[in-house]
Amino acid sequence: MNAARTYGLPVTQAPSLGVTDFAALGTYVRLVTTDATRIDEARDLLQTGLRALDEACSRFRPDSELMSLDDNVGGRCVRVSPLLAEAVAVALRAADLSAGDVDPTLGNALAAVGYDRDFASVAAFGPAVRIVTRPAPGWQRIRLDKAAGLLTMPAGIRLDLGATAKAFAADKAAADIHTRLDCGVLVSLGGDIAVAGPPPRGGWVVRVQDLPGRSEDEPTGPTSTVAISAGGLATSSTAARRWIRGDRVLHHVLNPRTGLPATSPWRTVSVTAATCVDANIASTASIVRGSAAPAWLARLRLPARLVGADGSVVTVAGWPASADCALEREGDGRPEGPAGPKRRAVR
């Protein structure tokens, strides 16, 4: 996605709000605070956190901690930083809760279809490449002791944390900024949105759009404006991060069962949940699950908006609405709390 573009566009405006935009992690970042006087401090905190995440988790930096694993693990147990351990734990949880629809062991598969560098450097057109069906090695082969900071994975596996890293960063940054500065905050990383603290009156108003575009531009394609007061909103799409090799259109949402770009009736899926990470797990898995996604999301009671390849829109579970549902496996037998189901299954 172009650094000046996003899917979830925070459009709440008021004189008391602080707003700042910049580029990071190969995408567009918007930060909003309910106290305009704290926006500079908040920006410093966010930029510091994003730099640390990039240094730990980037697949496109040869000096990142993640890339060093290719040379140093190879079936051995190695010590990793607390930040990388946390990011890997988030990715493994996503794989578990999505029954493998969101799998972090797709690094080699993404490189094979042409996504082997920051997306801004991926050529839009190129000669045909040999594309082979090859399932992901499988997230179950990764062993992580998060408390001890120890990671073990077989030789030949390349991790890609891109499916969850931005959502993880948004949740982490929003919570940290709220705690440190005692104000409401919204963090949007390429449309993965997390909020924390007291919202502005009427909630955080966000425009969700099918095709990317700048907030000041007239949106292209179907749009929806929603207000969220807590948790997160995430959008997964095959409409922007796409490229052509020969006569084949490729995109970055892979089906772990084939290692190839997912064939889906949905070009965009937006979900609200208790956290941005949970919303992102559900939105990405929905692209992979295809026609089964609406019933699955409805069963989880996760408000969602799905846009078909023809531009048709399907909404489920009361969209537009915020959700306080977090994700866990179906059929775990846990009782529901008095306020209704706080956790919902994902299988």
Predicted segments with their positions:
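Mature catalytic core of soluble alpha/beta enzymes
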Residues: 1-347
